[in-house]
Structures are given as structure tokens and as C-alpha cells.
């Protein structure tokens, strides 16, 4: 009988140890609060920053893909997300439709200053001030080699992410007339 008593005491210790962590968490209000906070943060990370959709409410329909064309600076300006819902910006002589990233390039976005403008100088020099914007065509000839390389990197990123809708015209330059076949070829090249 004496041999049975230590064995039973050992079983009780194992039973207490098995639920020990759970009892430790539930037994302390501080631990319970920290567990709740960790679970909430994990939920937020996994869920992402998607805004909650209201029942019966849909966001604005996506704009149709813009046909390829060239722009002067004046023709580009209305596409700032305010005067026109579409947002265009030029990078290194190419015009891109960045509407789907309006969170960044829209009126309230961190890069909103570039909407409807030639963003080349600002992106090349990492300047988000109005001084980086020119009212006339900017040939960017005064950029140093590092800034030119930075600009090419930005151009490459934009080419990969956004729809290239045309080129930025110099003063007096004639626009290119794009055919539907060229548009289709450009879309096919982007898919590859």
C-alpha cells in the first residue's frame, strides 16, 4: 500500500504539469490579456489592411484600360485623380496609368504630388517637393550618373507594375499614332 501512495502522488504531479501552461495563462489576468493582444495582432497581420466592405456597397467599378496615346505636359495634368478619376504620371519619358495604386499616387497618397505630372526628376532625386516638378518639358540632362540609374530603376518598376499608355512629348513633337495591333502586341509582351 505504501508503494501505491508514491505512485498516486506522481500521477497527480503529472496531471498538474500537463495542464500547467493552460492553468498558468488562465490563472493570471495579465497573461490572459497578453494572450488576447497577441491573438488580435496575429489576426490583423493575417487579415491585412483591407477595408471592411459594407453590405450592399460596392467600390467604384474599375476604369477600362486606356488606349495607347502620347501626352504633352498640359494633356497629362488633368489625370491627377481629382479632375479625372484616372491617375497618370510620366517616368523617364513614358506615361503610366497608376490608377490602381491610387492609395499611393492619389490626391491623399504619399506620391500624390506626381499625379498628372512628369515625376522623373522627383523620383531620380528622391524629392517629393514641388521644386522637383517642372512646368515645361524636362530633358533631365543635369542629372548625375547615380540619379540617372535610379530613374532607370524606377522606370523598370513602373513598366513591370503598371500599364504603359504612351510617351511624354517634347515641345513641338508629333504624337505617335498607335494601331490596335500595336496595343495588342504591347499587352502580349507584358504577359510574357
UniProtKB/Swiss-Prot annotation:
Transmembrane segments: 25-43
Keyword Iron: yes
Residues in Cytochrome b5 heme-binding domain copies: 70-169
Lumenal side: 2-24
Cellular compartment(s): Microsome membrane; Smooth endoplasmic reticulum membrane; Mitochondrion outer membrane; Secreted
Gene Ontology terms, MF aspect: heme binding; metal ion binding; protein homodimerization activity; steroid binding
Phosphoserine: residues carrying this PTM: 179
Disordered: region residues: 172-192
GO CC annotations, alphabetized: endomembrane system; endoplasmic reticulum; extracellular region; membrane; mitochondrial outer membrane; smooth endoplasmic reticulum membrane
Keywords noted in UniProt: Endoplasmic reticulum, Iron, Lipid-binding, Membrane, Metal-binding, Microsome, Mitochondrion, Mitochondrion outer membrane, Phosphoprotein, Receptor, Secreted, Steroid-binding, Transmembrane, Transmembrane helix
A biological-process GO annotation: positive regulation of lipoprotein transport
UniProt-listed InterPro entries: Cyt_B5-like_heme/steroid-bd, Cyt_B5-like_heme/steroid_sf, MAPR/NEUFC/NENF-like
Gene3D superfamilies named in the record: Cytochrome b5-like heme/steroid binding domain
Residues bearing PTM Phosphothreonine: 176
Regions of this protein lying in the Cytoplasmic compartment: 44-192
Phosphoprotein keyword on record: yes
Membrane topology listed for this record: Single-pass membrane protein
Ligand binding (heme): 111
Main location: membrane
Protein's job: Component of a progesterone-binding protein complex. Binds progesterone. Has many reported cellular functions (heme homeostasis, interaction with CYPs). Required for the maintenance of uterine histoarchitecture and normal female reproductive lifespan. Intracellular heme chaperone. Regulates heme synthesis via interactions with FECH and acts as a heme donor for at least some hemoproteins. Forms a ternary complex with TMEM97 receptor and low density lipid receptor/LDLR, which increases LDLR-mediated LDL lipoprotein internalization.
Free-text domain note: The cytochrome b5 heme-binding domain lacks the conserved iron-binding His residues at positions 105 and 129.
Subunit structure: Homodimer. Forms stable homodimer through hydrophobic heme-heme stacking interactions.
Extra remark beyond the main annotation: Non-classical progesterone receptors involved in extranuclear signaling are classified in 2 groups: the class II progestin and adipoQ receptor (PAQR) family (also called mPRs) (PAQR5, PAQR6, PAQR7, PAQR8 and PAQR9) and the b5-like heme/steroid-binding protein family (also called MAPRs) (PGRMC1, PGRMC2, NENF and CYB5D2).
Protein name: Membrane-associated progesterone receptor component 1
Amino acid at each position: 500500500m505504501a508503494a501505491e501512495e508514491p505512485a498516486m502522488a506522481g500521477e497527480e504531479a503529472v496531471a498538474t504539469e500537463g495542464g500547467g501552461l493552460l492553468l498558468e495563462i488562465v490563472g493570471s489576468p495579465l497573461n490572459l490579456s497578453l494572450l488576447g493582444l497577441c491573438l488580435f495582432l496575429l489576426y490583423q497581420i493575417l487579415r491585412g489592411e483591407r477595408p471592411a466592405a459594407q453590405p450592399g456597397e460596392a467600390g467604384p467599378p474599375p476604369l477600362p484600360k486606356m488606349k495607347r496615346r502620347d501626352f504633352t505636359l498640359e494633356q497629362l495634368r488633368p489625370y491627377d485623380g481629382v479632375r479625372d478619376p484616372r491617375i497618370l504620371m510620366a517616368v523617364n519619358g513614358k506615361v503610366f496609368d497608376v490608377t490602381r495604386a491610387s492609395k499611393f499616387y492619389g490626391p491623399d497618397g504619399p506620391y500624390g504630388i506626381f499625379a498628372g505630372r512628369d515625376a522623373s526628376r522627383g523620383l531620380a532625386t528622391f524629392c517629393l517637393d514641388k521644386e522637383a516638378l517642372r512646368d515645361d518639358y524636362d530633358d533631365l540632362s543635369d542629372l548625375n550618373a547615380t540619379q540617372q540609374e535610379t530613374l532607370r530603376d524606377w522606370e523598370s518598376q513602373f513598366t513591370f507594375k503598371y500599364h504603359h499608355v504612351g510617351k511624354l512629348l517634347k515641345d513641338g513633337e508629333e504624337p505617335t499614332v498607335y494601331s490596335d495591333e500595336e496595343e495588342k502586341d504591347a499587352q502580349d509582351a507584358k504577359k510574357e
